[in-house]
From Swiss-Prot:
Ribosomal protein in keyword set: no
Pfam families in the record: Sugar_tr
InterPro entries registered for this protein in UniProt: MFS_dom (IPR020846), MFS_ERD6/Tret1-like (IPR044775), MFS_sugar_transport-like (IPR005828), MFS_trans_sf (IPR036259), MFS_Trehalose_Transporter (IPR050549), Sugar/inositol_transpt (IPR003663), Sugar_transporter_CS (IPR005829)
Species name: Arabidopsis thaliana
Keyword list, A-Z: Membrane, Sugar transport, Transmembrane, Transmembrane helix, Transport
Functional description taken from the UniProt entry: Sugar transporter.
Protein name, as recorded: Sugar transporter ERD6-like 10
């Protein structure tokens, strides 16, 4: 009976949400706010930058896509840096790249400094996209892990909202300085938050694992069971594998790798990067006011992200991903139909509003699932021994595919507005099958329980 009571007390400690967990999450997700600002920046600043620096459409498309190119570089080294430096110091490095990138854009006198800043910003957000969800997943109690991890998407959307709302009325250089400001919070804040206990276990700092857990769960919490579970699972995985790059291709990890890469391909090939970067071009083509569209969109993006944050630990990951795929596919299809009707000169008075409404539909469903859950699931499904290599490959997939979409979007859109969105709708339909057949539910399980079930480790 005493053993049962102790287990109950330990479970209660594991579920505790402390001020330290909240502070640590806040410090980490400030980087995601800058990520959101970077995503929305090209849409709001497009006209002013092209006019002041005399850029062609090809040059501006390249500038927009360099965020993804830099992101691919950051993603390639993100996992290794997170192991060598730890999660906290990697967060610090992310923000140094972002600060340099934003300031380079803000003071750019020519396209070279503009592009250099965008690439540096990309490297920073590429590191961010890996280390922030991993750090949050490793420090939070399992029953709220999804909601806390989803806060990254909330902050990203807050950054997008800020840029969309003010981008058409604030000078593009001032806008870049505003984008840099949140990056200073993690630069200072990392000195006040604990390191990930799972990273500490991996490097063999047994005493520090318990110290970190005590800060996260409370000084009076009994963290012995959680610390033991982390250390046993980490040791088991390390003994089972020498942690080489090729380990992730073992049969037992095949499903997790396919799921991680597949979700990132879905996220990018559904067109989100292109639509976010160049939404003003879509409004212009549809005949809808760019300023009004940007401001309404800016107000809309935050509540839609809140919905996903509230539902992720109630409904689970799979239902939200499935609903997201259906909604995005329908939204893309209806935008394509709108541009088809426009080309046929049918219902011209309704086309602008219809396109705008369906862009909101698309992004509403994007936000509750495919927008952020692939990163959350990536941070959950890979065991510590392959998290570096597999996580880096998955992040690299996202950024390289995002570069392809963001660079090619303007050219595709000029070729055929409706054809572009029909392609995105088709991707949404295929993603529904992929999610239904392969993606596991991760809600309510500890990372160790989840990874054991996926790999068959006992």
């Amino acid at each position: 009976m005493e053993e049962g009571l102790l287990r109950h007390e330990n479970d209660r400690d594991d579920r505790r949400i402390t001020a330290c967990v909240i502070l640590s999450t806040f410090v980490a997700v400030c980087s995601s706010f800058s990520y959101g600002c970077a995503n929305g920046y090209t849409s709001g600043a497009e006209t002013a930058i092209m006019k002041e620096l005399d850029l062609s459409m090809a040059q501006f498309s390249a500038f927009g896509s360099f965020l993804n190119l830099g992101g691919a570089v950051g993603a390639l080294f993100s996992g290794q840096l997170a192991v060598i430096l730890g999660r906290r110091r990697t967060l610090w490095a992310c923000d140094l790249f972002c600060i340099f990138g934003w300031l380079s854009i803000a003071f750019a006198k020519n396209v070279l400094w503009l592009d250099l800043g965008r690439i540096s910003l990309g490297i920073g957000v590429g590191l961010t996209s890996y280390v922030v969800p991993v750090y949050i997943a490793e420090i939070t109690p399992k029953h709220v892990r999804g909601a806390f991890s989803a806060s990254t998407l909330l902050l990203q959307n807050s950054g997008i909202s800020l840029i969309y709302f003010f981008g058409t009325v604030i000078n593009w250089r001032v806008l870049a300085v505003i984008g840099a400001l949140p990056c200073f919070i993690p630069v200072i804040g990392i000195y006040f938050i604990p390191e990930s206990p799972r990273w500490l276990a991996k490097i063999g700092s047994v005493k520090e694992v318990e110290n970190s857990l005590h800060r996260l769960r409370g000084k009076d919490a009994d963290v012995s069971d959680e610390a033991a579970e982390i250390q046993v699972m980490t040791k088991m995985l390390e003994e089972d594998s020498k942690s080489s790059f090729c380990d992730m291709f073992q049969k037992k990890y095949r499903r997790t790798l396919v799921v991680g890469i597949g979700l990132m391909l879905i996220q990018q090939l559904s067109g989100a990067s292109g639509i976010t970067y160049y939404s003003n071009a879509i409004f212009r083509k549809a005949g809808f006011s760019e300023r009004l569209g940007s401001m309404i969109f800016g107000v809309f993006v935050i509540p839609k992200a809140l919905v996903g944050l509230i539902l992720v630990d109630r409904w689970g990951r799979r239902p939200l991903l499935l609903a997201s795929a259906v909604g995005m596919s329908i939204g893309s299809l209806l935008i394509g139909v709108s541009f088809t009707l426009q080309e046929m000169n049918l219902f011209p008075e309704f086309i602008p509003v219809f396109v705008f409404i369906n862009i909101l539909v698309y992004f509403g469903f994007f936000a509750i699932g495919i927008g952020g859950l692939p990163w959350i699931i990536m941070s959950e499904i890979f065991p510590i021994n392959i998290k570096v290599s597999a996580g880096s490959i998955v992040a690299l997939t996202s950024w390289t595919t995002g570069w392809f979409v963001s660079y090619g979007f303007n050219f595709m859109f000029e070729w055929s507005a409706q054809g572009t969105f029909y392609i995105f709708a088709m991707v949404g339909g295929l993603s529904l099958l992929f999610i239904w057949m392969l993606v596991p539910e991760t809600k309510g399980q500890s990372l160790e329980e989840l990874q054991a079930s996926l790999t068959g480790t006992t």
